[in-house]
A protein has these predicted regions:
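Conserved small/polar residues in nucleotide/adenosyl-binding loops
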Residues: 261-267
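P-loop NTPase nucleotide-binding core
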Residues: 2-20, 56-194
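N-terminal pre-Walker A segment at the start of P-loop NTPase domains
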Residues: 14-54
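Conserved Walker B catalytic segment
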Residues: 171-242, 246-253
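Short, flexible loop/turn elements at secondary-structure junctions
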Residues: 14, 23-25, 70-73, 87, ...
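Extended non-catalytic scaffold regions that mediate assembly and binding
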Residues: 53-57, 199
């Protein structure tokens, strides 16, 4: 039986740095299995052959999130960077946004704002370019889509907070639903200007910001489950699970405290 040989290459001084493989070099790398599986999933979600008639559309999951999970130094970031690099070479129909770093995510800047901000940066670059009448009109429509998302984003920060009234609670719910629709509309308008069919969003080290990891995961689930979008994340599953567990504990303790206050008022 022929043995499959994988190459492990070390560069002095760069042993712990992520590597960025291309469409040829990744095949003989130790990370080839993980990268190949991710490429296969993206091909399954978004076939490169547009002439293929698919009869399995109902089997394509709505939640198209791909995760590279493992301990520190196991190659998660390398997989993420290599995947983007390979898709840049192979798939001209996919819009590849700059990788989001949760280090910039805090109580004043959530994950959705970072993603929208990355898209808006490209939008500003397009505005500086020469454009014909048709492209100008497309950029105007895209600008309106950004404004709509920005209005809905204003309510996200208070989503998990206790509302002062049932009316405010309903307003928050309506804004949450509205944001999901406005983000989808923004992605569609963005892809038209970019002249791409699909979008790939990559988020590295999602578990590093442990105190806000649960909120990041929830916002991805709520607002980025979009037909034309694949989200790729890298992180340590145990640390992410622990962060989510702690968030549920804090929420449960808050509910218990509210219940105790309500009991005292009614007694």
């Amino acid at each position: 039986m022929e043995r499959l040989v994988k190459t492990l290459t070390f560069k002095i001084g760069e042993e712990t740095r992520p590597v960025k493989l291309n469409k040829d070099s990744y095949k003989d790398n130790l990370l080839s299995a993980q990268i190949s599986k991710a490429l296969g999933l993206i091909e399954e979600f978004f076939p490169s052959d547009k002439t293929t008639i698919r009869d399995d559309l109902d089997d394509i999951p709505a939640n198209k999130t791909i995760s590279f999970l493992g301990d520190r130094g196991t190659g998660k970031s390398s997989c993420l960077k290599s995947l983007v690099n390979i898709l840049t070479e192979k798939r001209k129909d996919i819009c590849l946004l700059e990788t989001i770093e949760p280090a910039f995510f805090d109580k004043h800047r959530n994950i959705m704002e970072l993603i929208i901000g990355t898209m808006f940066g490209k939008y500003e670059d397009w505005l500086d370019e020469q454009q014909d009448a048709n492209r100008h009109n497309l950029l105007v429509e895209l600008g309106y889509a950004f404004q709509e998302v920005k209005r809905d984003l204003q309510y996200i920060e208070s989503e998990c907070c206790q509302e002062d009234s049932e009316l405010e609670d309903l307003q928050g719910l309506a804004s949450s639903i509205g944001l999901s629709a406005s983000v989808k509309k923004l992605v569609d308008a963005f892809l038209i200007v970019e002249k791409k069919d699909y979008m790939l969003i990559t988020i590295d080290d999602i578990d590093l910001n442990a105190s806000l990891a649960f909120e990041m995961a929830e916002q991805i689930r709520k607002y980025l489950i979009i037909d034309k979008v694949v989200v790729c994340i890298a992180g340590k599953s145990e640390q992410l699970s622990d962060a989510i567990r702690q968030s549920y504990i804090r929420l449960y303790e808050l509910l218990l405290e509210q219940d105790r206050k309500s009991t005292r008022l009614n007694s």
